[in-house]
Every structure is written in structure tokens, then in C-alpha cells.
From Swiss-Prot:
This is Uncharacterized symporter YjmB. The keyword Membrane applies. The gene is yjmB. Gene3D superfamilies: MFS general substrate transporter like domains. Induction: Induced by galacturonate, repressed by glucose. The keyword Glycoprotein does not apply. It is found in: Cell membrane. PANTHER family: MAJOR FACILITATOR SUPERFAMILY (MFS) PROFILE DOMAIN-CONTAINING PROTEIN, MAJOR FACILITATOR SUPERFAMILY DOMAIN-CONTAINING PROTEIN. GO terms for biological process: carbohydrate transport; sodium ion transport; transmembrane transport. GO terms for molecular function: symporter activity. It is a multi-pass membrane protein. Its main location: membrane. One of its GO terms (cellular component) is plasma membrane.
């Protein structure tokens, strides 16, 4: 089927449903992605503070500046992909997964190296390497996210591949959270252990990206680049004229910052509040393992309640569990049970988000006459990078404010502060995210179905 739009020709295979193999392969893409991304989110702050010897507040500044830089460059990367000419038989997005993942793996190892120089020299290297890593990540993650919208317009298939993507993401988070620390403690010198272990996982990430590249197919094909010139104003126009995108961006800033600050602070909580850093592996085995329950039931929940209400339910579960966990005394068993419930809750809206992005891409095409998958996804990714910079900054500056001292016995104030960063901030942020998706997001599943029908009628 061919659909004539204002400035390009789109080839769409609308009838064919996605096979289980293709859905799983798409999920393997985020599985591979997590073997590089999660390493930075979980372990890089601790590497900076405890191995490289960078003060916590300065380490937080690295995350803030580097992620803000990546947030700014994301729309540029996305637009450059959308405006690329001479798209070959491999498709618009898939080649980036094949080549970009190899580059990203190398960059992942480099961010876990620290030259034997002054603190100023270490800061310069950390800033430079992490900012370059961010660009490399954008050239992989944006095409990967855009690929989902190019594979199908079927709402059920989109929910399905979003579910597989979330399973892949949780699978990688599960493995990196459980397996990395036991491997690191086997090295007498952490300056050697970190790059070796991270290099092992990054290589596995490349393999899983290759599976995604090989087995996924682009069916909604743009045969021409947009005729409108690539300018800052064209990118801004795409953003401000898409109200569902604006709302999703705002929601994501709160939801992802909550999710990431949890990942970063758990290692500190295990080491200092519970007194044994190796407990982190066992806790994560249960916590992240439990979160698969939310993802498994996601398609059925969406059928029953719709995407919007299902996301609100998930946020509500997580908020309640985190607040109760914060108020109770620190106990490894109680903490693990409540943290598991919270992760089940947050896994639900996190999984739905990817389907919402694809819906928003269709909305943008319906409203403007131009289909810009990569630009739209990069603008959404902009919010994720802002959230990541916020969580990294809050983690670092928060540790400084509460009086955290690396590799030492912490004060009572510091222990309470670590617990607040781990549980109280996420509860507040997720409550705000629940309000935003519930009252500000207006694109319903029924409206999206009508939009897809309108687009097909133009054929």
C-alpha cells in the first residue's frame, strides 16, 4: 500500500502482523542496549567517587552537564537521520544498530578508565569521555526507538513489541545489577576490574543488537527526505505542534529521573545502610526479577484499562510502596519486598511509554503531513536525557549535602539522606508523573485508531 503525503511517498505494509520471532528480536535490541546503558546508570557514579577519586558533588556535575549536552544533541542526531538521503535496502534505521553498537561498546569501556593525573585532569577526561559516549549512544538508541514505529502501525503489535522491549530492558538491568558486582569484587584492583567487566558486557550488547538488526524489518518506509530544510525552527516546530509529545516529555522527566536515581543509589544503600554491598546482587535478583510480572501482564492490562489508565495504576503502586518503605526501619527483607512491589509498578508505565511514542509519531504525521520518526523519537529522548542529567546531578549533589564520605562509616544524617534519595524523591516524582499522564495527556487509544484509519484512507 502507498500513501501520498504532502512532501514524500510512504510505502506501508499494513496487513502483515509481526511474528513472534520479530517481536522477540526487537526486544533483544533493548537487551543489548542495557548491557551498555545500565552500566553507566548504575555503576559510573560509584566509579567516579570511589575509584577515580572524584568528589561526589563534582561527579554529579559530570552527569548534569554531559546529559544536558546529550539532550541538546539528540534532536540534531534525530533530524540528521530523518533527513538522510540515499536510503538503501537495509532501511533507514537498521544500519545504525549494526555499526553504532560497536562504536558504543568501545566508548563504554573508555568511560570506566581514569588517567593517573590530578583531579582536574580526571574531570576533563570524565567530561570528555562521557559526552562523547552520549553522542554515540544517541546514534544507536534513536534509530532503535524509531524502528518500532517503522515496523507496524497495528496497536496490538505496538503494545506487544513495547512489552518485549521492556522485557529486554529489564532482562539487561537484571543481569547487570546481579552479575557485575560479584565480578568486580574478584579483582584486587578496581581500576582494572571495571574496564574488563564493562568490556565483557558491552561485547554481549553488540551481539544482541546484531540479532535485532538481522531479524527486524522496516515496513513503513519513507522513500524521500522531508522537503522542508533541516533547521532549528523545523525541529522546534515538530515539538511544539505535537501536544501529546509535549505531555509525554514532561511525564518522562519525572518518571525516568525517579527510576534512574533508584538505580544509582541502591549500591550506596546496600553498602552503608544495610552494611554489605554484596547484598545488592541478591536484592536485585528479587527486585528486578519481580518486575517482570508487571511486564508480562501489560498487554492484558492495556486491553482492560487502556494505555493511559494502566500507566496511572502502575505509577500509583510504585508511589505507595516507596512511601511505606521510606517510613519503615531499614531491614533487608522488608525493603526487598516493598522495593519489588515498587518495581512491578514502575515497569508498567515504562513499558507503555514506547507504544505511546509510536502513537505520537502517527499523530504528528496526521497533523502535519510529514512522518518524522527519528526527530520525534529524539525529542522524546531529549526528556529522558534531561531526566538522566537530573538524577545524576541530584545523586551527586545530594550525597555531598548529606555529608557522604566514600569508603567510611556514614553518619546517621548521611544514612537517612541515602534512604531519602533512594525512596522519597522517586515517590514524589512518580506522583507528579501520574498526575501528568492522567490529566494532561489527551491522545486516547480510540483517537489513535481513528488517526491510523485516516492515514490509510489517503492511499
Amino acid at each position: 500500500m502507498r500513501t501520498e503525503l504532502a512532501n514524500k511517498v510512504v510505502s506501508v505494509e499494513t496487513e502483515k502482523r509481526l511474528s513472534l520471532k520479530e517481536k522477540m528480536s526487537y526486544g533483544f535490541g533493548d537487551f543489548g542496549n542495557g548491557f551498555m546503558f545500565d552500566l553507566g546508570q548504575i555503576y559510573l557514579l560509584k566509579y567516579f567517587t570511589d575509584v577515580a577519586g572524584i568528589p561526589a558533588a563534582m561527579a554529579g556535575g559530570i552527569f548534569l552537564v554531559s546529559k544536558l549536552f546529550a539532550a541538546i544533541t539528540d534532536p540534531i542526531v534525530g533530524s540528521s537521520i530523518d533527513y538522510r538521503k540515499n536510503i538503501g535496502k537495509r532501511g533507514k534505521f537498521r544500519p545504525y544498530l549494526l555499526i553504532g553498537s560497536i562504536v558504543l561498546a568501545v566508548l563504554t569501556v573508555l568511560i570506566f578508565l581514569s588517567p593517573n593525573v590530578s583531579t582536574t585532569g580526571k574531570l576533563i577526561y570524565a567530561y570528555a569521555s562521557y559526552m562523547i559516549w552520549g553522542i554515540g549512544y544517541s546514534f544507536v538508541n534513536i534509530p532503535y526507538g524509531s524502528l518500532g514505529a517503522a515496523m507496524t502501525q497495528n496497536s496490538e503489535d505496538r503494545t506487544s513489541i513495547s512489552t518485549f522491549r521492556q522485557i529486554g530492558s529489564l532482562g539487561a538491568l537484571f543481569i547487570t545489577s546481579v552479575a557485575v558486582m560479584p565480578l568486580l569484587v574478584k579483582f584486587d584492583n578496581p581500576k582494572v576490574g571495571y574496564p574488563v567487566v564493562m568490556g565483557l558486557f558491552a561485547a554481549l550488547g553488540v551481539f544482541w543488537f546484531y540479532i535485532c538488526y538481522r531479524n527486524c524489518k522496516e515496513r513503513i518506509i519513507i522513500s524521500e527526505a522531508p522537503k522542508e530544510k533541516l533547521t532549528l525552527s523545523s525541529v522546534v516546530k515538530t515539538f511544539i505542534t505535537n501536544k501529546p509529545l509535549l505531555t509525554l516529555v514532561l511525564m518522562t522527566i519525572f518518571s525516568i529521573s525517579a527510576y534512574n536515581i533508584k538505580s544509582a543509589m541502591l549500591v550506596y544503600f546496600a553498602q552503608y545502610n544495610l552494611g554489605n554491598v554484596e547484598l545488592m546482587a541478591y536484592m536485585n535478583f528479587i527486585i528486578i526479577g519481580s518486575s517482570f510480572l508487571g511486564v508480562v501482564f501489560l498487554p492484558k492490562l492495556v486491553k482492560m484499562f487502556g494505555k493511559k489508565r494502566t500507566a496511572m495504576i502502575g505509577f500509583g503502586i510504585s508511589v505507595a510502596a516507596d512511601l511505606i518503605n521510606f517510613m519503615l526501619p531499614s531491614n533487608v527483607y522488608v525493603f526487598t519486598i516493598l522495593a519489588s512491589i515498587a518495581f512491578i509498578g514502575i515497569s508498567i508505565p515504562n513499558g507503555i511509554t514506547w507504544a505511546l511514542v509510536s502513537d505520537i509519531i502517527d499523530y504528528g504525521e496526521w497533523k502535519s503531513g510529514e512522518r518524522k520518526e527519528a526527530t520525534t523519537y529524539s525529542l522524546f529522548n531529549f526528556s529522558r536525557k534531561l531526566a538522566q542529567s537530573l538524577s545524576g546531578f541530584l545523586s551527586g549533589i545530594g550525597l555531598g549535602i548529606i555529608g557522604y564520605v566514600p569508603n567510611a562509616v556514614q553518619t546517621a544524617q548521611a544514612l537517612i539522606g541515602i534512604k531519602a534519595l533512594l525512596l522519597l524523591y522517586p515517590a514524589i516524582a512518580l506522583a507528579l508523573a501520574m498526575f501528568i499522564i492522567g490529566f494532561l495527556y489527551k491522545l486516547t487509544d480510540q483517537q489513535h485508531a481513528q488517526i491510523v484509519q485516516d492515514l490509510h484512507q489517503k492511499s
